[in-house]
Swiss-Prot record:
The keyword Phosphoprotein applies. The keyword GTP-binding does not apply. Disruption phenotype: Mice exhibit abnormal development of the cerebellum and severe ataxia. This is Transmembrane protein 176B. Keywords: Differentiation, Membrane, Nucleus, Phosphoprotein, Transmembrane, Transmembrane helix. GO terms for cellular component: nuclear membrane. It is found in: Nucleus membrane.
């Protein structure tokens, strides 16, 4: 304000003159770069689940699957030292063990990364592990039923029977007789021990396949529950953000403006 003195009828009167005032109003709007970064962040949030704490129970199930797969492959190698059975013919110990190892690795990777794609791949591997382990269990049970049957034992122990001397004029083969009964008894004892060992390997493989099914089902249940919980959490966060935006609307402006006003 500027003061001046004015004389009115011989009386000095102080008068004031208004001074121009400038008021600057700034309206800020996000730049194009900020909007681009926000869009990239939204896309990344859509493609991945929100971060959560690591479930060590899920990790332990993954490690258990890997160990069961290794044991299955080792038992498959041992089975090839025995008589030929369905387990050896189909090689179920190897493909069921390999799928179990892959499922365990997929579970561990998903628990570390916690992504949507890794979760779907992990669930598919777990389903494949359940299917292969179930097929191997069926083959193992059929093999056990056959190995515990009486005709199978008679066929195996017939190799220890004493050979009778005979001459076949058509083929010219000769079989020599062995009168020592103790050798026959000793052969049957060793053969019985080997058959029991082979039967134990088959039982262990069947049990391992059953354990693979149990562990895979448990891991699949935990994975589905975790995925459902994370999706619900993401929906709740989006709803909360929407409520906040509705409560505090942002002003719409084409660009940053500076409006001078003179009073």
């Amino acid at each position: 304000m500027v003061q001046s003195t004015v004389t009115v009828n011989g009386v000095k009167v102080a008068s004031t003159h208004p001074q121009s005032a400038h008021i600057s109003i700034h309206i800020h709007q996000k730049s194009a770069l900020e909007q681009l970064l926000g869009a990239v962040g939204s896309l990344k949030k859509f493609l991945s689940w929100p971060q959560a704490r690591i479930h060590y129970g899920q990790l332990s199930l993954g490690v258990t699957q890997i160990l069961l797969g290794l044991v299955s492959c080792a038992l498959g190698v041992c089975l090839y030292f025995g008589p030929w059975t369905e387990l050896c013919a189909f090689g179920c110990a190897f493909w069921s063990g390999s799928v179990a190892i892959l499922a365990g690795v997929g579970t561990i990777v998903h628990e570390k990364r916690q992504g949507k794609l890794s979760g779907q791949v992990s669930c598919l591997l777990l389903l494949a592990c359940i299917a292969t382990a179930a097929a191997a269990t069926v083959l193992g049970v059929n093999s056990l039923i056959r190995q515990t049957s009486v005709p199978y034992y008679v066929e195996i122990f017939s190799t220890c029977n004493p050979l009778q001397s005979s001459m076949d004029p058509g083929y010219g083969t000769v079989r020599y007789s062995d009168d020592s009964d103790w050798k026959t008894e000793r052969c049957r004892e060793y053969l019985n021990m080997m058959m029991n060992l082979f039967l134990a390997f088959c039982i262990m493989l069947t049990v391992v396949c059953i354990l693979e099914i149990v562990v895979s089902v448990a891991s699949l249940g935990l994975s589905l529950r975790s995925m459902y919980g994370r999706s619900s959490q993401a929906l709740n966060e989006e709803e909360s953000e929407r409520k906040l935006l509705d409560g505090h609307p942002a002003p719409a402006s084409p660009a940053k403006e500076k409006i001078p006003a003179i009073l």
